[in-house]
Amino acid sequence: MPVQGRENMDPKSPGYLALIAQRESLDAQIIAARKAEREVAIGQIKALMKEFDLSVLDLQERVQKRNSKRMSTVPKYRDPATGKTWSGRGRQPAWLGNDPAAFLIQPDLPAI
């Protein structure tokens, strides 16, 4: 029994199963190409590291220094009703109203 709706399709175009098989073949080719190019890239990186006397630690330090600049700020204000906080940067939340000092978070006082 012929499949309905197939009569309007181009008989020369590949069917669903053929396209799935092509995709699987392409996926395998992509994986193989990525693996080969990855090996080349690793070789180039190793050569540059040797040329400039770099270690993995040198690279890690650089990344850590860059990430340390993006530290989050400590909240200065807290809404007692919801527990939401605001650091004092950016747009002031509506819950602060006209008296932000009333919402200041008190630093922990040292024990006497």
Curated annotation (Swiss-Prot):
Residues 65-92 are annotated as: Disordered. Belongs to the histone-like protein H-NS family. GO terms for molecular function: DNA binding. It is found in: Cytoplasm, Nucleoid. This is DNA-binding protein Bv3F. Residues 89-94, 89-95 bind DNA. A DNA-binding protein implicated in transcriptional repression and chromosome organization and compaction. Binds in the minor groove of AT-rich DNA. Binds nucleation sites in AT-rich DNA and bridges them, forming higher-order nucleoprotein complexes and condensing the chromosome. As many horizontally transferred genes are AT-rich, it plays a central role in silencing foreign genes. Encoded on chromosome 3 and plasmid pBVIE02. InterPro entries: H-NS_C_dom (IPR027444). Homodimer that oligomerizes on DNA into higher-order complexes that form bridges between disparate regions of DNA compacting it. Its main location: cytoplasm. GO terms for cellular component: cytoplasm; nucleoid. Keywords: Cytoplasm, DNA-binding, Plasmid, Transcription, Transcription regulation.
